[in-house]
Amino acid sequence: MLQSRPRHLLAACLAIAVAGCHQLDFHPRVPEGEIDIYDDLFAVSVVDEMHAVAVGYYGAVYWTDDGGDHWHKGDAETDDLLYSVSMADTEHGWAVGQVGTILRTDDGGRSWHRQPNLKEDEGSHLFGVHAIDANTAWAVGEWGSRILTEDGGATWKDESLTISTDHPMFVWLSLPDQQRVREGKKVYEDVGLNNITCLDPPSRKCWIVGEFGYIFHSEDLGGTWLRGEILGDVRMDPILFPYNVIRIQPGDKKRLAEFAKKIEDQTHLNVLIDPFVSARELADFGHPEDPYALFDIISARIDETKSVLEEAGILLDRMRMPNKPPWDYEDFLSDDPTFLERYFEGRKAEQSMIRVSVIQNPYLFTVFFKDADEGLISGLGGVILRSEDGGRTWRYEDAGRKQALFSVAEADGRAIAVGEKGFVRVSTDDGKTWKEPPPDSFPPVFTFMRDLGFEHKQRVGFIVGQQGMVLRTKDGGKKWTKVLPPGEVGLGRLL
């Protein structure tokens, strides 16, 4: 440290000397309100053919009122990352982001003001927002955040996902959190909700997607939410075990290996290993004072199953065993005396078995519905889901690659999904099949494209992404051109 000090003094002296010879100019290099640094953009809201707003890194807000020919910098008065934006009309809208940030604009994105809310107090990130009208909006985010305003954002009502005593995750909570649940206090579910969308009035349908394959649909603008179901074609009959036997028979090993091979490359699919014991085994080995003999049997059968799956190519981190033996059950008994009894009851079946099934838990980024019935979802690993019944059930469609697809939308009979490293897929049959876009329909893009949207007439649309990139279409997505940054200007470079 002593040796480096003269260097710092020299640098300071040089700075003073230069300042004495040349007047330093700290004035902006571009007019106020114009874009100087092209930050990463994470979301865009397209109001009509003329008006759109995009938001992103370090509080970046860009707005246009001439169809995207010129973009201007809005005054967000924050350095927080902004993950989503939704405009109710040409003047009013919201943006949400880091640590519960909610911003409101009443002048088309030119200026914004912060709206206090409970998620800001909790420090929970907000990932998605949808403006139903100038007074009503939903926002979603981490820790199951789901909040609603009906007064323009003056107040926000908490409708977040919480854990109850009968919730599957209750037993995995810390003891203090379990006690909070018993006392009726809120303990939020550890899941991120990434996107929310609603159809325009008079429809009252809305949808939410997020981590772990979470999909919700509502028929009453979010008054009630119901879970959607992802349908899969990979199933397997249970592995049966004779009394007090832990080895899997050769025929069952073959079936299990064949099951694993079907999903080996579908890394968004995990495997549930669910053990059950017969009434006889429970009576002989499941003593309340000493359950460890039964625990040993269950654990050995689980380990056998895991071993076969691993040999067939399923990594251990894709296996889920929520009902494995609770070896630390005594830690729970003082607060929950019936804990072990309920575990035994939940593991009892007519015959000892291991049920192996697929857990549909893809990481989902964006949901889009063109009408009340037909919808699309994009996600991590090239996931595309399609629904024909308003979001009640979903099926996988093949995108052809495993790169992330961050956003999906449809216009004029053409569905488009965009993602990382310039990954684009197009469908002209309502999302049933996907292929590369035609040559020359997109400019060369090698960075991420984070969001896309169209105006209501489905002609003008924008894609936003890394280094302030904005692509525009004027023909419903057939042809896209770059409008930002101008020329070769990119992130961190000044005009």
What are these regions (language model features)?
Residues 11-19:
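Bacterial N-terminal signal peptides
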Residues 241-281, 306, 310, 359-361:
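Periplasmic peptidoglycan-binding/anchoring modules of Gram-negative envelope and division proteins
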